[in-house]
């Protein structure tokens, strides 16, 4: 009865689809999934025919990030951008399930049974404005798919920052400095364990760098990151 009243529809364009949380063929084809070869740190596609072993992109080679490995599922453009903006600002929590499955597929080679999954935290003021932390939703789903631990309170954002949308890479790094800290009450959970930090979008990497540097205080075995979408470098 409910199925006839509310048939499944595409998450992006509302066209009829076969199952819940799905995309129609045109929208699916417009999602820019990232495939290998890609940067070992930030997941940016690398334009190279033959690469041997993990390789950084030019930006990560010149300025290595504060983590050891990273994966990204999508490029932040076309339908992927619309989907993420709907999740972030449009209360479209129904989009998290498929998005997390794509992220899990991209980062599952980084996961081990003892990996601790956490998410980039929101400052409480921004949390009140958005009502939820989209990175935390993704982290919960990824940890559930992998059947590993999720630590929602591992990191905390103790200083609000000005919006980063129009800031340069240098401005982003300056604004994010000392904004994220390891929660002392949860630090022991991180000791000698691999940690995976989840975020929805990576542009310059300043936010994830701040989160990774905060994790260092807990002496983890390894720090990795997983990003739902990577901003193309000509967009910042």
Regions found by a protein language model. Give the residues of each.
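Glycine-rich phosphate/pyrophosphate-handling loop used in enzymes and phosphotransfer proteins
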Residues: 1-199, 203-236
């Amino acid at each position: 009865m409910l199925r006839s009243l509310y048939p499944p529809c595409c998450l992006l364009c509302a066209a009829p689809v076969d199952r819940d949380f799905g995309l129609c063929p045109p929208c699916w084809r417009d999602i820019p999934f990232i495939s290998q070869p890609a940067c070992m740190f930030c997941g940016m596609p690398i334009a190279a025919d033959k690469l041997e072993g993990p390789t950084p992109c030019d930006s990560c080679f010149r300025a290595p990030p504060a983590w050891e490995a990273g994966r990204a599922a999508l490029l932040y453009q076309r339908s992927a951008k619309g989907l993420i903006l709907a999740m972030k600002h449009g209360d479209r929590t129904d989009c998290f399930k498929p998005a997390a499955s794509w992220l899990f597929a991209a980062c599952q080679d980084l996961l081990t049974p003892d990996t601790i999954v956490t998410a980039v935290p929101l400052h409480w003021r921004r949390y009140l404005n958005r009502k939820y932390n989209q990175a935390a939703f993704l982290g919960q789903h990824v940890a559930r798919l992998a059947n590993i631990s999720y630590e929602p309170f591992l990191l905390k954002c103790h200083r609000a920052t000005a919006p980063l949308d129009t800031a340069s890479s240098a401005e982003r790094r300056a604004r994010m400095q000392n904004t994220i800290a390891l929660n002392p009450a949860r630090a022991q959970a991180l000791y000698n364990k691999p940690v995976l930090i989840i975020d929805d979008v990576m542009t310059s990497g300043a936010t994830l760098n701040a989160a990774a540097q905060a994790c260092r205080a807990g002496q983890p075995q390894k720090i990795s990151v997983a990003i739902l979408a990577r901003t193309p470098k000509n967009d910042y």
